[in-house]
């Protein structure tokens, strides 16, 4: 792809997300979502392969359907309330349709089937954009309309997302599909708390973005797309293997890593609101995600292909390409748990 085209698409992604974030009118928020969708499709089809083209078409169809529902619900809300302000969606039917449309855009269950298939068919860096940057704009709309949402609907979406996100990743061997199912489960955690404590959703989103970007960058640097390809990564790049291990354990929510913080705070808020059964179901669903994270770690650290002793020293001679954001993102995704009291105070 031409550097000029890549620059235009990247700036369009930034413009679309910024428009949605700062907009207080439904039409401009919708325009931002559309710019985002149209800008990411050329990045998804960059390899000019039939699989990437198929994935881009699937993504476009899902996003176009969701955008149509968003626009229809905004018009329906305006016709009954005479309000185009983004944060005011007082009509119950419009709120229901808006929630369903945003769930489709985020890949929440039961509208999640496109996420693993699309992620698997595109390059790692395009998958990183799909599972990180493309989540910001829909969640910002969720944040703005959070007082008008239906709690029962959110509970159904979040529980099914966390359970199916964990269940779907159990028998996967493709790393992109595993990260896609991980994204579905994390979106479920963000959805359940957005009505009770919206600030926790933003905190969870930031930490999820840091961890997922770290994983994709390291996998792209090592050209790893399958679990068995990680078994030789320890010989080639021991630091990358350590980063993958820490990031996966953090995504699984194990203390004392950063990923434990949002799960801890969300469960605490749910218990404070007497949603103890819901908190228990979310906590148990995390074990499913943790299982396939541990499977990756086991395959990459405790199993190796038979090799001569000289190959075990390759990491010392391997030409490492330094990617500057990786160390910073690793620290954010692994070592911020001691700062939990500060985040509680700020929120």
UniProtKB/Swiss-Prot annotation:
Subunit-level organization: Core subunit of respiratory chain NADH dehydrogenase (Complex I) which is composed of 45 different subunits. Interacts with TMEM242.
What this chain does, per the entry, is described as: Core subunit of the mitochondrial membrane respiratory chain NADH dehydrogenase (Complex I) which catalyzes electron transfer from NADH through the respiratory chain, using ubiquinone as an electron acceptor. Essential for the catalytic activity and assembly of complex I.
Query: One Pfam family for this entry, by name?
Result: Proton_antipo_M
A GO MF term? NADH dehydrogenase (ubiquinone) activity
PANTHER family reported for this sequence: NADH-UBIQUINONE OXIDOREDUCTASE CHAIN 2
Q: State any GO CC term.
A: mitochondrial inner membrane
Instruction: State the source organism's domain of life.
Output: Eukaryota
What name is this protein filed under?
Answer: NADH-ubiquinone oxidoreductase chain 2
What is this enzyme's catalytic activity, as reactions?
a ubiquinone + NADH + 5 H(+)(in) = a ubiquinol + NAD(+) + 4 H(+)(out)
The membrane-topology field of this record reads: Multi-pass membrane protein
Query: Is the Ribosomal protein keyword given for this protein?
Result: no
């Amino acid at each position: 792809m031409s550097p000029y085209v890549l620059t235009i698409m990247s700036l369009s992604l930034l413009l679309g997300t910024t428009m949605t974030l700062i907009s207080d009118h439904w039409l401009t928020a919708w325009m931002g979502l559309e710019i985002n969708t149209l800008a990411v499709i050329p990045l998804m089809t960059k390899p000019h392969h039939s699989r990437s083209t198929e994935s881009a078409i699937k993504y476009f169809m899902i996003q176009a359907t969701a955008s149509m529902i968003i626009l229809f619900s905004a018009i329906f809300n305006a016709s009954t309330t005479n309000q185009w302000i983004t944060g005011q969606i007082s009509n119950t039917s419009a709120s229901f349709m808006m929630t369903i449309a945003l769930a489709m855009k985020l890949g929440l269950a039961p509208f999640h089937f496109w996420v693993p298939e699309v992620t698997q068919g595109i390059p790692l860096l395009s998958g990183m954009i799909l599972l990180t940057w493309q989540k910001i704009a829909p969640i910002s709309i969720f944040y703005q309309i959070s007082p008008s949402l239906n709690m029962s609907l959110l509970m159904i979406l979040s529980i099914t997302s966390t359970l199916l996100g964990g269940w779907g990743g159990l028998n996967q061997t493709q790393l992109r599909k595993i990260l896609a199912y991980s994204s579905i489960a994390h979106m479920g955690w963000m959805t359940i708390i957005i009505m009770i404590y919206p600030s926790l959703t933003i905190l969870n989103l930031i930490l999820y973005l840091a961890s997922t970007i770290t994983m994709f960058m390291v996998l792209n640097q090592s050209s790893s797309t399958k679990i068995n390809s990680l078994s030789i990564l320890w010989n080639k790049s021991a630091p990358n293997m350590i980063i993958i291990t820490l990031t996966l354990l953090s995504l699984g929510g194990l203390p004392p890593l950063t990923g434990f913080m949002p799960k801890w705070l969300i469960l605490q808020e749910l218990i404070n609101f007497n949603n103890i059964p819901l908190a228990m179901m979310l906590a148990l669903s995390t074990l499913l995600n943790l299982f396939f994270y541990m499977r990756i770690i086991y395959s990459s650290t405790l199993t190796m292909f038979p090799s001569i002793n000289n190959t075990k020293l390759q990491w010392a001679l391997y030409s490492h390409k330094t990617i500057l954001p990786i160390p910073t993102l690793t620290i954010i995704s692994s070592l911020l748990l001691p700062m939990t009291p500060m985040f509680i105070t700020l929120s």
